[in-house]
Amino acid sequence: MGRLPEHQDSAYLRVLAIYPQAKVTHRLDMATSGLLIFAKHRDAEVAMSKLFQARQVTKHYIALVQGQIPLQGSVDVPLITDWPNRPKQMVSFEHGKTAKTLFERINYNAETNISRVKLTPITGRSHQLRVHMAHIGHPIMGDELYHPEPKRFTLPRMALHASYLAFQQPLTRQNIELDLPASF
């Protein structure tokens, strides 16, 4: 949420209208679609935050990336804020924080030279998936920050979608799996 009029509408504000005590448990980049978890109260927020910190929440994203990405692999390069170019992040082996992403190609379209890929972040750095894909030469289609030609893509937004979350509900211990297919 920000002060500008375009920042006065958000998923969080919409949830607050229904659950006034709701708390944010994690975030998505503004251009990323998909699943979000909100806690109904402070105790649930604290418990969910602990699950995220302990990496006990499984997250998968679906993305369309430029080029034919390998069938599977990982990107394990440290990230840091690119201060002169905020909000951009960048790879820094000297000063960056550990960041790891697993990827698995779902399919490749030779006509468009675009791969559909499942991304699994092991860590949770800002813009991690976006920077990692660009770093290995497969930027996410429509990414205004990290794709050298973001307008080359026909969708009106970035092709990155939080499609899957799984965790043990911290208060009831019920196993929860949420799946929301990408619209692209």
Which residue stretches match the model-derived regions?
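RNA pseudouridine synthases
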Residues: M1-F184
